Amino acid sequence: MKNLNQVVDALKQGNVIAYPTEGVFGVGCDPDNEQALLNLLDVKKRPKEKGLILIAASIEQLLPYIDLEQLTEEQVNTIKASWPGPVTWIVPVKTSTLPLVTGQFDSIAVRVTAHPQVKAICNAFGKPITSTSANLSGLEPCRSVTEVEAQLGDTGVVIFQGEVGNRTQPTEIRDAKTGNTLRQG
């Protein structure tokens, strides 16, 4: 288990980290490091077509990855009103975003977190990190450091000591263009 500085150093070195979120532990990496993204997909046994979520401390951290010009002012205001919080939005993506982040899609899933430890990681790292649940494919997501160690301990994942929030449901996922809810939260 590592402290904040060690976790940020691990991100800068291209490592995959495990960290607490609003409801479960997540695993993530630097969204601009292709090898780190490949390592993350390997740890999760996740198909690259599925894409990943970016989680950030602020909307400003997401601006290099998202194309808000394709959205109306009302759509952008709706997104901003839901953050920080447990709502993930599917938004248009900038072409400079690595395909391993977007998967088979021409959009990207993004969230501004309210979890203080994730905010601290993103602020110290200076940008968003990828986020997907910390578990091996087919197993339940981890809710404690002990569970992360049991499932992912031999994968080289750097674990950030912390507590998950009290959410029992996954985050809600909504489409920014249509407003449709794709997953209830």
UniProtKB/Swiss-Prot annotation:
Top-level taxon of origin: Bacteria
Chain coiled-coil ranges: none
Subcellular location: Cytoplasm
Catalytic activity of the protein: L-threonine + hydrogencarbonate + ATP = L-threonylcarbamoyladenylate + diphosphate + H2O
GO MF annotation list: ATP binding; double-stranded RNA binding; L-threonylcarbamoyladenylate synthase; tRNA binding
Enzyme class: transferase
YrdC-like domain ranges (all copies): 1-185
GO aspect biological process, one term: tRNA threonylcarbamoyladenosine modification
Keyword Nucleotide-binding: yes
Keyword Oxidoreductase: no
Pfam families for this protein: Sua5_yciO_yrdC (PF01300)
This enzyme's EC code(s): 2.7.7.87
Keywords attached to this entry: ATP-binding, Cytoplasm, Nucleotide-binding, Nucleotidyltransferase, Transferase, tRNA processing
Predominant place of localization: cytoplasm
UniProt GO cellular component terms: cytoplasm
InterPro entries assigned: DHBP_synth_RibB-like_a/b_dom, Sua5-like_dom, TC-AMP_synthase, TC-AMP_synthase_SUA5
Role: Required for the formation of a threonylcarbamoyl group on adenosine at position 37 (t(6)A37) in tRNAs that read codons beginning with adenine. Catalyzes the conversion of L-threonine, HCO(3)(-)/CO(2) and ATP to give threonylcarbamoyl-AMP (TC-AMP) as the acyladenylate intermediate, with the release of diphosphate.
PANTHER family: SUA5, THREONYLCARBAMOYL-AMP SYNTHASE
Family of this protein: Belongs to the SUA5 family. TsaC subfamily.
Protein name: Threonylcarbamoyl-AMP synthase
Source organism: Aliivibrio fischeri (strain ATCC 700601 / ES114)
